[in-house]
Amino acid sequence: SEGFSLYVGIPFCPSICSYCSFSSSPVGEWKDKIDAYLDALIKELKALGRMAGERKPDTVYVGGGTPTTLEAGQLDRLLGTIRNCFDLSELKEFTVEAGRPDSITREKLMALKKNGISRISVNPQTMKQQTLDIIGRHHTVDDTIQSFKLARELGFDNINMDLIMGLPEETLDDVRHTMELVKELAPDNVTIHSLAVKRAARLTIFKDRYSDMQMINTQEH
């Protein structure tokens, strides 16, 4: 009853996926603002640490956006601040959304490992290249596979993978293919989301571009 969960948001991504309605900006356009954002975030974390007093977090989750749009040194600075500001002696899980394979590097994963991250998420959403291109993901299926294998090589033994069902132009056979490839990687957890296109998503804003594409939007049901 005395514990709490801490969520830390990094509102930057390599690119903005067409289905996404989260508050996130393309990192290429905001790269010169990231250090200022981190300065403000760290100031807030220090204040929260003082407010927490003797209370200890049960879980810490660093999400976004895509936290690994930060450079390795920036990740190290952020995670080190969390470790210094809060008593993590009773922490059950420390998760970082490693996220998109096009932002994962050995150096960044090593920074996560150094700071005691116990769980990461590698999120392809689909293992069909055509769909990745349609939804604006600038990575390949093989990038996903290699990023996952790299994380295993570096000793991460609790890896989640996020998938979305109902993406544009995907069939049941495409989903089966995705699941077969994911099964071969043997992640420790798989999170399945159904596509829910909200008003801030590009699929809504530019809906004429996607009007002839088949998709299953659970937001309409």
Question: Over which residues does each language-model region extend?
Answer:
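Flexible, acidic/Gly-rich N-terminal and inter-domain linker regions that tether
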Residues: 1-3
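Canonical Radical SAM [4Fe-4S] cluster-binding loop centered on the CxxxCxxC motif
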Residues: 5-36
